Amino acid sequence: MTGPDARPPPLAEQVLERGHEMRTTLARAAAMLPLRPDEQAAETFMELPPARILRYPAANAGSAMAPVLIIYSMINRPYLLDLQPRRSVIRQLMQAGADVYVLDWGEPAALDRDLDMEECIGEFVRTAVSAIRAAHDGSRLNVAGICQGGTMAVCHAALHPESVQSLANFAGPVDFHTPDNTLWRL
């Protein structure tokens, strides 16, 4: 049978229908794949082995906005702040005119097991803050800490308030005197 009203033979119909089902299934499977970060390009501002400080320059050079230091948790990856162009804390801060710095602890290794909070705050965070302030004519920083980094940020701000313009703590524990000392045992 030929012409515009002609139907394909039954086997061809089955193949076409099966192909449509496969395309639909593949599209659903692709939507469930893990999200890969589309990270904004960063420069390494400073190496502090095992950590490093990443710098994301402000979108408009010469902005009067104070720099932002994000102190991330040692066990999480900071790219979570920069997953996609429209879902990026880092890009939003850059667009607002901030130079953004991220303290990236790198992948945990056996050598890091002896790092304690005193060393992390007293050496790594303090050194990062000092270097960033020096690069910005001594400006005080907007400091944001996430999870364990929030605890470090709060401790640094308490020890060195002269270096901090503002402080944001996202999910960082600060009360270690709960009735059962729950956080202390973690």
Give the ranges of each region predicted by the language model.
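N-terminal cap/leader regions of alpha/beta-hydrolase-fold enzymes
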Residues: 1-186
